[in-house]
């Protein structure tokens, strides 16, 4: 398959850069929200957001909304099974008033983007969520503490997917027409071929999703854009 590749700079941890990037784009057939950080100590983005929430969710929220109906086919978000162990603290999304946990911060950011994806589907946007499972990537490259050691020794015993294998759920979401809001995850939680998987109620909660959307608009200054709007 032949094609052209064009590379552009985009830092989802900086909303000014997100706006500049979105303004430069005329059309998107398929948007894949795949940026991610994991296991960072308490860090703030350029806009003051906690780094996991700011990068993994709020940056993607802003980008998706600013592109708006320039997205012609579908929007896909790469998520994580860690959402199942998470609880979204909607009144303290950016960890100003509670003891920080980098693992909880990551899980909450993934739960947030799943709620956002479900709300997009309710608003008529074709959207899917994909989970790569246990995949050997550099997402933990900036992690401190025990995780690098645990990761190395765990993957010796239980081999992780290659990045190419981990991408299969996303490729399936790009190339297959499924009901909007579908969640594709490995058959055996972290391993196995991707299949459509039922979301837990916490990721499908319409009231929480609406609250999160409204708060995200307030925090980012971005809302869904219609290109025909004056």
Region spans (language model):
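C-terminal segments of enzyme domains that contribute to small-molecule binding surfaces
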Residues: 200-225
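Rossmann-fold NAD(P)H-dependent dehydrogenase/reductase core
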Residues: 1-143, 218-230
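Short acidic, glycine/proline-rich loop/turn micro-motifs
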Residues: 44, 194-200
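A short C-terminal helix-loop "cap" of Rossmann-like NAD(P)-dependent dehydrogenase/epimerase domains
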Residues: 96, 146-155
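Pocket-edge positions in alpha/beta enzyme catalytic cores
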Residues: 10, 158, 201-204
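Short, flexible, mixed-charge acidic loops at enzyme active sites
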Residues: 88-94, 142-147, 184-193
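C-terminal helical subdomain
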Residues: 109, 153-196, 206-210, 214
């Amino acid at each position: 398959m032949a094609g052209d590749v064009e590379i552009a700079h985009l830092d989802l941890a900086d909303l000014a850069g997100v706006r500049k990037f979105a303004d430069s784009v005329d059309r998107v057939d398929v948007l894949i929200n795949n940026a991610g950080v994991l296991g960072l100590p308490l860090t703030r983005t350029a806009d003051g957001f906690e780094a996991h929430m700011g990068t993994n969710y709020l940056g993607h929220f802003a980008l998706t909304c600013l592109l708006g109906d320039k997205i012609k086919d579908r929007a896909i978000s790469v998520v994580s099974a860690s959402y199942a162990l998470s609880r979204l603290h909607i009144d303290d999304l950016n960890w100003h008033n509670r003891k920080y946990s980098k693992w909880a911060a990551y899980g909450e950011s993934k739960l947030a983007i799943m709620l956002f994806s479900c709300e997009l589907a309710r608003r008529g946007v074709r959207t899917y969520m994909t989970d790569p499972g246990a995949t050997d990537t550099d997402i933990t490259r900036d992690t401190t503490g025990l995780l690098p050691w645990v990761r190395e020794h765990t993957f010796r015993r239980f081999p992780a997917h290659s990045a190419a294998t981990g991408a299969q759920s996303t490729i399936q979401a790009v190339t297959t027409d499924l009901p909007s809001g579908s969640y594709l995850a490995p058959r055996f939680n972290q391993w196995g071929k991707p299949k459509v998987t039922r979301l837990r109620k916490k990721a499908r909660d319409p009231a929480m999703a609406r609250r999160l959307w409204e708060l995200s608009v307030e925090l980012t200054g971005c809302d869904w854009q219609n290109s025909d709007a004056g």
